[in-house]
Amino acid sequence: GCNAAVLERHLSGNGIIFLRNEQYETTQMFDSVKIGLRYLQDKCDKILFTPVDVPLFTAQTVNILLDSGAALACPMCEGKQGHPILIANELIPEILDDCGEMGLKGAMDRCTTPLLRIDVDDPGTVHDADTPEDFSALVDYHNSQLVRPVVSVSLTKEKPFFDSKIAMLLTLTDETKSVRAA
């Protein structure tokens, strides 16, 4: 989007791979979804997709989705379909080939694999953060649920020579076949 460079600068030290839709002004959100799916295809068994304004679902919701055994699933809270959406790798080609009418929701409705809707008690799955007040309320709820380990590995001789930044550089160099593009 229009703030991609700013977001990338703020998040660059977090081990994130950034993908851009350079035609964001003239395309739909589903086109951006497809860019991400193309990149992730065959790199993992399942992915979890969420729009940027629905970031604060809980780890418990993620575990419920992953443990469901479904190839296509989403959480339901307060009678509403939410995020993240679980998509198995084998469904990515079908979604990429979809016409895009009604976006990802339409593609899931047309998918040959039925969507499993799973009830969860997690308001973060259905409430977006469009305003500062929305975001503050979601952050408060999310932080009350938050417990997570953080692990970092580096190799050191006299000075550290391999850390998460070098690992990311090597991953991106392998992906792009270019240090410059990485």
Go through each PLM region and give its residues.
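Short helix-boundary/capping micro-motifs
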Residues: 177-181
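Conserved alpha/beta core of the MobA/IspD/sugar-nucleotide pyrophosphorylase nucleotidyltransferase superfamily
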Residues: 99-148
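Short, glycine-/small-residue-rich phosphate/pyrophosphate-handling segment
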Residues: 80-111
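Short beta-strand-to-loop acidic/aromatic patch adjacent to the donor-nucleotide binding site
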Residues: 44-55
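Short alpha-helical "packing" element that flanks the helix-turn-helix/winged-helix DNA-binding module
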Residues: 169-170
